């Protein structure tokens, strides 16, 4: 798998607020998680912090440390779940630094990175993607009820 990813947890790794990270640490078919950026738990293994099982996923204290130890990286994933889905302002510098080093950002929060002009401009400048997974598709791409399911025959 080539989708090598760094999880950004902003100090929440050892809390329930990092449930996105917890799931990805346990396993992912889409991404190869190669590290976690979490200053309070830096130097430990992410699996050990999560549930006591070593998974060979190092925790680092900075983006520069991640880049020097874990390269190549393709993605940084905002791997926390906050009250209201708000992006903590404290994460913005790490996100910007990741973008400046060519990492696309995957964001599962309800606050969209694509709504932040400075982040969008930076991503365009460095040729990376901002993937807001919770952003709904445009209305013209949505599928509406057609009744087609009623044509399916199935044994009872």
What are these regions (language model features)?
Residues 72-89:
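Rossmann-like NAD(P)-binding element
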Residues 50-69, 86-92:
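Glycine-rich, highly charged phosphate/nucleotide-binding loops
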Residues 140-156:
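Walker A (P-loop) phosphate-binding motif
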Residues 33, 39-58:
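N-terminal beta-loop-helix "entrance" segment that forms/cooperates
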Residues 86, 109-131:
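Rossmann-fold NAD(P)-binding glycine/threonine-rich loop
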Residues 97-114:
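ADP-ribose/adenylate-binding Rossmann-like module
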Residues 1-32:
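N-terminal phosphate-binding or glycine-rich loops at protein starts, especially the Walker A/P-loop
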Residues 15-16, 41-47, 112-115:
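Short, charged/polar "capping" segments at the starts of alpha-helices
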């Amino acid at each position: 798998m080539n989708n090598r990813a760094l999880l950004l947890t902003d100090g929440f790794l050892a809390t329930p607020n990092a449930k996105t990270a917890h799931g990805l640490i346990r396993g992912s078919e889409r991404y190869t998680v190669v590290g976690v950026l979490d200053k309070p738990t830096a130097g430990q293994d992410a699996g050990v912090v999560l549930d006591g099982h070593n998974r060979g996923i190092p925790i680092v204290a900075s983006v520069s440390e991640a880049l020097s130890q874990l390269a190549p990286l393709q993605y940084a994933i905002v791997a926390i779940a906050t009250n209201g889905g708000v992006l903590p302002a404290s994460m913005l510098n790490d996100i910007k630094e990741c973008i400046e080093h060519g990492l696309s950002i995957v964001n599962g929060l309800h606050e969209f990175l694509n709504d932040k002009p400075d982040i969008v401009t930076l991503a365009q400048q460095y040729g990376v993607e901002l993937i807001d997974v919770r952003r709904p598709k445009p209305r013209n791409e949505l599928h509406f009820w057609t009744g087609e399911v009623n044509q399916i025959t199935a044994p009872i």
